[in-house]
């Protein structure tokens, strides 16, 4: 059974290169894939200012970050296919890609996969959880034709 994904993409910034809605759809479907048969997801691509404001408000960190995940948490008695929202900062992704010698496309794919896994409940706070999440991310990213995102370039 293939995933039916309703994706809302919001481009709230500009850049020399941003992923297309088709690329975002492919990467999100790959990450969510077998976890659900229907899902709704919003991906908002923002500038550093908006990322910093959200990161400060929700995580207490007064700086922009690559990706923020906001899972939708419905009351237990309500079953909705709403997965949640991802907010991705284009400038941070660009800087990280450059620093890590990765292509923009590869790093964007990694950030979408990483964020979707957070929405599915994965985390990387504890070492054991981090290993599980990174292993799954690596499998998913490699299935998309990119190299291991955690391998030093």
Curated annotation (Swiss-Prot):
The entry's keywords: Cytoplasm, Endonuclease, Hydrolase, Metal-binding, Nuclease, Ribosome biogenesis, rRNA processing, Zinc
PROSITE patterns: UPF0054 (PS01306)
Cofactor mode of binding and number, as noted: Binds 1 zinc ion.
Enzyme nomenclature, EC number: 3.1.-.-
Binding, Zn(2+): 114, 118, 124
Main location: cytoplasm
A GO CC term assigned to this protein in UniProt: cytoplasm
Family: Belongs to the endoribonuclease YbeY family.
Function comment: Single strand-specific metallo-endoribonuclease involved in late-stage 70S ribosome quality control and in maturation of the 3' terminus of the 16S rRNA.
Full protein name: Endoribonuclease YbeY
Lineage: Bacteria, Pseudomonadati, Pseudomonadota, Gammaproteobacteria, Alteromonadales
């Amino acid at each position: 059974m293939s995933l039916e994904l309703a994706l809302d993409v919001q481009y709230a910034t500009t850049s020399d290169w941003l992923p297309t809605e088709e690329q975002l759809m492919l990467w999100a479907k790959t990450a969510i894939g077998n976890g659900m048969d229907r899902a709704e997801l919003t991906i908002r691509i923002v500038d550093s200012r908006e990322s910093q404001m959200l990161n400060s408000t929700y995580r207490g960190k007064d700086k922009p970050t690559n990706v923020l995940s906001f899972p939708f948490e419905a009351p237990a008695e309500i079953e909705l296919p709403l997965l949640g929202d991802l907010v991705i900062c284009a400038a941070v992704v660009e800087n990280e890609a450059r620093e890590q010698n990765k292509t923009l496309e590869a790093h964007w794919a990694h950030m979408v996969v990483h964020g979707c896994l957070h929405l599915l409940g994965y985390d990387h706070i504890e070492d054991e959880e981090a290993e599980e999440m990174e292993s799954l991310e690596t499998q998913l990213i490699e299935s998309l034709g990119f190299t291991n995102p955690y391998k030093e370039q």
